[in-house]
Amino acid sequence: MTMGRIFYIIKADKEIIRTESGGENAMDRYLKETEMLDYSSKNIRQLIAKRKWDRLDAFRRVQAIYNFVRDEILFGYNTDDSIPASKVLADGYGQCNTKGTLFMALLRACRIPCRVHGFTIDKALQKGAMTGFVYKNAPQNVFHSWVEVYLDDRWYELEAYILDKAYLTRLQQQNSGCTGAFCGYGVAVQDLQHPVIDFDRNNTYIQSEGINQDFGIYDAPDDLLKAHHQEMSPLKTFLYRHLGRHLMNRNVKKIRRQK
């Protein structure tokens, strides 16, 4: 696979965001609750109350929620991309699309505007996390997304919440000889040992070098999935849900536990 990132500069529009005062909000559509972004769910409200994220300033709020989704919701494969945020939280694990759904729900519950950007990535990026017949039978183009967050009058592209630090650290240790580009095990970056994964008013990426198709920006994952989704036959979908993802999750756990 020749890695090549499709790069887009997305300029923030001139719409005024007033999330703290409770006044009119010109981008209310980026704060709406949806079927997938079900932030009124009991477990989501309890989590926010426990963590007290809504008491933080906007930057610290985004940073704290980002770190929670990245490191406390472990990298793993759920039953389907369309599950709601409350289910992702209950599962305690997720991948790009499902962790993104939870991230967006938590942000919107805390009055941080956000949207979703859809793509596909080459399946070579998943090699290692996927193995054997699971990898062989996986679609060549894997459905992918990241979350874009509006803060300080600009949009930030955030993707590196996908892999928890414990998993990524093990990959870095197991591939300590790699000092440049790396593609596999859920990673596609220019520099494996120094990827930009921490949010400090910057974009973060962990799979962007594997992008091979851009579907554009949508208000919510519900809208994205109405237009695009993972293309698999009914049989392959059944096998993924009931066998493939369990093998993948077992493999990911094995990597995370290795010393």
Describe the predicted segments one by one:
Residues 5, 63, 255-258:
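Long, composition-driven mixed-charge/polar low-complexity segments
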Residues 23, 33-42, 101-109, 113:
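Extended, folded domain segments that form the structural surfaces/walls around functional sites
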Residues 26-91:
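Secondary-structure boundary elements
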Residues 32, 36-39, 121-259:
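His-Asp-centered catalytic microenvironments across diverse enzyme cores
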Residues 67-68, 105, 109, 145, ...:
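Residue-level signal for well-ordered alpha-helical scaffold segments within enzymatic catalytic domains
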Residues 78-138, 142:
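Active-site neighborhood of thiol-dependent amide/isopeptide-bond enzymes
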